[in-house]
Structure formats: structure tokens, C-alpha cells
Amino acid sequence: MACLLETPIRMSVLSEVTASSRHYVDRLFDPDPQKVLQGVIDMKNAVIGNNKQKANLIVLGAVPRLLYLLQQETSSTELKTECAVVLGSLAMGTENNVKSLLDCHIIPALLQGLLSPDLKFIEACLRCPRTIFTSPVTPEELLYTDATVIPHLMALLSRSRYTQEYICQIFSHCCKGPDHQTILFNHGAVQNIAHLLTSLSYKVRMQALKCFSVLAFENPQVSMTLVNVLVDGELLPQIFVKMLQRDKPIEMQLTSAKCLTYMCRAGAIRTDDNCIVLKTLPCLVRMCSKERLLEERVEGAETLAYLIEPDVELQRIASITDHLIAMLADYFKYPSSVSAITDIKRLDHDLKHAHELRQAAFKLYASLGANDEDIRKKIIETENMMDRIVTGLSESSVKVRLAAVRCLHSLSRSVQQLRTSFQDHAVWKPLMKVLQNAPDEILVVASSMLCNLLLEFSPSKEPILESGAVELLCGLTQSENPALRVNGIWALMNTAFQAEQKIKADILRSLSTEQLFRLLSDSDLNVLMKTLGLLRNLLSTRPHIDKIMSTHGKQIMQAVTLILEGEHNIEVKEQTLCILANIADGTTAKDLIMTNDDILQKIKYYMGHSHVKLQLAAMFCISNLIWNEEEGSQERQDKLRDMGIVDILHKLSQSPDSNLCDKAKMALQQYLA
């Protein structure tokens, strides 16, 4: 059967491969070098703009032969150059073409060609990898495999405007992350590329600008250097500002704004600098206008969101610039009408990419509403905004869902909105759906937002708990992702705050004592702190304290002992002592402290600690244990006096810290009463 099946498959492939395509490849093997050269030139003309022909030639094995000719010392420079040109043309086809070229190890061969003294050949050898590296299927690491390549490319920057354009383009596509930035920076990228910003060639200026944007992104070292670079007597930020003026091409305005944004976010330019407030921010707002192309609006909104994200003043300025909040509402109505876009190709492109606009709008709304209550109110009052966000939570695109959750999370920081809009639109329902099955990046933001919805004043708290939130959150605490563990335990902490005994019992049952112990020994400090916060909230109000300690007392006391003995910071120890103070406030629970000499000695030790916070927390424990109005107080006071606690209280009553002094005096009063 296998033999019978093979024939039609081979026939279908071969039917695609025309006789003329075979003829082109056959000529590459001619013994006459002139005929080979002419064959390569004819092949070059045949493949221009013809993807089918490119695919045919690749299937017929043209690539290995072209690479062989390119690397042969006996080949003339003209032949080598033409081979590089054809390979560059083949790379401009489909992604499959690029994969085929990569499989033939084209990059090392072309980079080797850069050692030639011939400029035309060098340019052809650069043009092809420039095309290959711009493809998403090409691993950037191929540029960094040989350590001699980057310094050689830096040296070639001075050869011609084409070497400048292609090399900058290669750098901007292959600079992904801090390791690549460091390599390029250490090989003099800033000094070698800076002067290209004043090149007569627009393409060179543009590629140099793109280089600086990827070099500066989240990189303080590069950004701090860029601020002080002079080009023809002008500082780089001044050059970038000139490049984002309205009379410059949009691509240049946008990329300059990105450079200044990244330098600002990296701490090299102040957020209140005029070049940010009066130039960069207004330029990015302009890019959000509906007159701009879809990709310009997307890039403008996303860059602006990144610029203003940490700074409340920039958020306020942006929110009142050119009616930005209303302008972003248009991102959800795009394209508004078929007649508005006469170019059918453009319409088709925009319909396929309209989700990117929604994603960008959500991102910018999230940044705008991060801090200011009035801005959040304006966003929510924008037409159908809550409905749009809720719809965004169930979009097929993961990126849109993530941006919608982030936007909702930003708005959920408002007490007012949690009580009104979030309740009116039952936001918790789609959010719980998102939490059932989503990638980690969405889960982190969605669970963080759930923490806000579970705050005690939120009307959504009750229905969320009724829909099985406790179990879901306990599941998150077992995640390998520390951010999810933190959010799971944080949300449980909020749930336990002033909760009924039944909810607290549900939490302890679903979480299990074993998991609680695991969380208390978690290597992530945030997880530990939130777990202590949860315990503190569980152990509040006397009946609850006594009930929980009657069933889990032994394990909780064990955990407290371990933490107080461990190498933990002041905040962790303070929280732990506060838990002890809560236990000491129980009616029967306090016996677990009084019968544990080890714990009593630890409380005594922390009363004499050098840190006031720990002394105060230990004082709360003592005050709760000796309070006069409670049964058995006399025996407890006597035992603590025998331990030397009263002497310590006398010392603390002389403390320069007024709070500590008052608490000590109040405790001593209990002995005198």
C-alpha cells in the first residue's frame, strides 16, 4: 500500500516544478563559468516577485548550489555577488522559503562573505541576512554565535549608506533583551550609530533611530549614555525631539517618541522634563487619532501606555490632552465604514488586525486609570465601556483578553467603582470564567483583580464566594508560579477579613494544614507575608480564635515557633508576633501560650529587642495575657512576673518611644489594679 500511495504525492510535487525551473538549476552546474554567471543572472530576473518560482527553485536544490558557488575561491566576485542577490530574493518569499534557507546554513556562509574587500559583494551579503533576520522564523542568536561578527559589522558601518542601513536593520531586529543590548553596547553601538542620525539618507536615519529604540528599552545603562551623546554639537534627546515634529514622516515621529519614552522609563530623562511633557506625550496622543493608520494608532497607544504607566502626573496630563479618553472609544468601532477605506487590501488588513486596536485601547485605559479616581470615572462613563471590557474578557485573542483583564484590574482599584459599575455589570461572572482556564499571564492579573473584588466592602464578594472561589484560590496557592501563589493567598486573606466562622472553616478545610505549612516555609517573601496575614485574619474575634485554635492550635503554635526562630526580616517577625497577640486574645486559646515556656521566652526576648516594631508587637501579647477583667488573669500575671516580665515593663515605661512607653505603663496598670 505504501508504494501505491507514494506515486501521487511525488507527482503532485513534481507537477508544480516546471521544466523551465529545472533548466535554471541545471545551468548552475555548467562547466563554463560565464554560462554559470548568465544562468544566475537569468535566475535572478525569473524570481523577482514570483513566489511560485522561488519555491520551485528551492525544491530543486538551487540553494546549496548557490551557496557552494558563493563560497568557492575560484568563483569571480561578480558571480559571488549575483549568487548573494538571488539568495536575498529567495529570502523575500514565504516563511517556508526562509526556513529552507536556514536549513542550508545560509547565515554563516553570508557572514563569511563580509570578509571580502569588494563593497558590492559585502552589500549583497548584508542585504540577504537583513531580509532573513526580519522574518519571525529566524533565531536572533544566529547573529551572536561567532563572537567576531558584531565587531566586524561595526567596522563595516563606515563603508557605505547601504551597509549602514542594512547593519542597523539587522541590529534592530536581532536585539532582543538585555544580553543582546549589552553585547552591542560593549562593541560601541552607541558611538558607531549616533552620527548616522544626521545622514543624508532617510532610510539610514530611520534604521539608526530604530536601533536606539531597541537598545534603550528597559536599559538604564544605555539610556544614561544616550542622554549625554553629542552629534554635531547637539545632544541626542534634542535630535530625537526634532525628529518627532509634525513635519517629519509619521514613522520617524513614532520611533523618536519611543526612544524618548524608553529613556524616560529607564530613568535617564525626568518625567516632568519638557521633552516628555510638551513633546513626546502630545506626539503619542496625536498617533491615537482616527486619521492615522491602524498600526500607527496601535503603536502610539501602546507606547503612551508604557510612558505614563508609573507616573500619576503624566496620566492626568494625557487624560486631558486632545480628548484622549473619548478618542480611544473609536478604537472599538474600527473600521467604522467600508467607504472610509477605499483601498480593499487595506480594508482586508485592518479587519484582520482590528483586535490589535482593542488590545492597545485596553492597555492605555489601564495606564490612564492606574491612580486617579476622576480618570477612572471618566473611562467608565465612556460609552458602553464596561460592556466592551466584559466582552474583551472572552475574546479569542489571548493578548486582547490579557489587556481587558489589566484594564479591569486598574479600574477595580476604585472603591466607588467596585460598589457601583462593577456590581451593575456583574463583572465577577466573566472574571470567574477567565480564572477557570487561562494562561498564567492572564491568571496573574485576573487573580490580582479578584483580590480587590473580595475586599470586605465589595458587593461582589458574596456571589464570588458562592460560586466556589475558595477552592479555586486554594488551588492557586499550589501553583509553581510565585505570583499566582501570592495572589491566591492574598485573595484568601481578603476573604477571611471580618468573615463569618463558616467561611474561615471553609478556607482552612480547602487549604489544609499541610499546605498552610508549605506556604509558611515558602522561599518567596511575599507568599510568606500574605500567609501570615491570612492567619492573622483567621484568628480574629474571640469565638473564632478559640474554635480554630481548638482544632489547629498545635500546628499553628509550631509554625509560629519556627518563624520566630528562623532567619526572617523584621516585618515577618512582627506579623508573627501579631498572630500570637491575637491568640492571646482568645478565651481558651491563650492557654496554648501560657503552657508553652518556649513561646513565652520568645515573647520576653522580643520585648527587649532593639527594634521598636517588634517590642510593640510583643507588648500586645503581654497586654492580652495579663488583662485583669478575664478569668485566670491573676495566675497568668504571677507566672509572667516570675519570668521577669514586670521588670522589663518598668524599663520600657522609660522608653523614648512614646507609643512603647504608653503601652508599658498601661500593662503595669493591670498589675496595680
UniProtKB/Swiss-Prot annotation:
Do you know which InterPro entries this protein is assigned to?
ARM-like, ARM-type_fold, Armadillo, ARMC8/Vid28
What GO terms fall under cellular component here?
cytoplasm; GID complex; nucleus; ubiquitin ligase complex
Ranges in coiled-coil conformation? none
The compartments listed are: Nucleus; Cytoplasm
Q: Which sections of the protein are ARM repeats?
A: 51-92, 95-134, 138-176, 178-217, 224-265, 269-309, 313-352, 374-413, 416-455, 458-497, 501-540, 543-585, 588-627, 634-673
User: Does Cytoplasm count among this protein's keywords?
Assistant: yes
Q: Which SMART domains match?
A: ARM
The SS bond pairs are: none
Q: Which Pfam families match?
A: Arm
On this chain, the residues bearing Phosphoserine are: S337, S512
Question: Which UniProt key words apply to this protein?
Answer: Acetylation, Cytoplasm, Nucleus, Phosphoprotein, Repeat
| SUPFAM superfamilies (UniProt xref) | ARM repeat
Q: Which residues carry this modification: N-acetylalanine?
A: A2
GO terms in the biological process aspect are: proteasome-mediated ubiquitin-dependent protein catabolic process
* Domain of life where this protein originates: Eukaryota
Q: How does it assemble?
A: Identified in the CTLH complex that contains GID4, RANBP9 and/or RANBP10, MKLN1, MAEA, RMND5A (or alternatively its paralog RMND5B), GID8, ARMC8, WDR26 and YPEL5. Within this complex, MAEA, RMND5A (or alternatively its paralog RMND5B), GID8, WDR26, and RANBP9 and/or RANBP10 form the catalytic core, while GID4, MKLN1, ARMC8 and YPEL5 have ancillary roles.
Record function comment: Component of the CTLH E3 ubiquitin-protein ligase complex that selectively accepts ubiquitin from UBE2H and mediates ubiquitination and subsequent proteasomal degradation of the transcription factor HBP1.
Protein name, UniProt field: Armadillo repeat-containing protein 8
**Organism from which the protein derives:** Pongo abelii
Q: What is the lineage of its organism?
A: Eukaryota, Metazoa, Chordata, Craniata, Vertebrata
